[in-house]
Regions:
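FAD-binding core/adjacent interface of flavoenzyme oxidoreductases
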Residues: 1, 71-113
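Beta1-alpha1 glycine-rich phosphate/pyrophosphate-binding loop at the start
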Residues: 2-72
């Protein structure tokens, strides 16, 4: 029935995808779109910087985990959101139509303010 698209597969988008897939019946499609094919647990970055952890211990490939739960995954940067037509244009030229859109791309920090 409905196609729910979530932009961003970080600490907001990934759990949102899991929850939606769990709560909605299989007639609905849930798709996560993320510029990278990996999840990085950002709170662990200081541990990596100090040498307490390796990068491989704080990142993992998203696709196998999402697809195991019935969530579609597109590893591609979104260029534009065409809200009037419910479409997302991706960096590779593909277009993804949606019925509902969740934007969970994280903050843009303003260090210069």
């Amino acid at each position: 029935m409905a196609h729910i698209v979530i932009l961003g597969a970080g600490t907001g988008g990934t759990p949102a995808g899991y929850e939606m897939r769990h709560l909605l019946d299989k007639s609905h499609t849930v798709t996560l779109i993320n510029a990278s094919d990996t999840f990085q647990f950002v709170p662990s970055n200081p541990w990596v910087a100090l040498g307490w952890r390796e990068t491989r211990e704080t990142t993992f490939k998203l696709r196998p985990y999402l697809e195991k739960k019935g969530i579609q995954f597109i590893a591609q940067r979104a260029d534009t959101i065409d809200a009037p037509h419910s479409r997302i244009h991706l960096a590779n030229g593909d277009v993804v139509d949606y019925d509902y859109l969740v934007i969970a791309t994280g903050p843009r920090l303003a260090f210069d303010l």
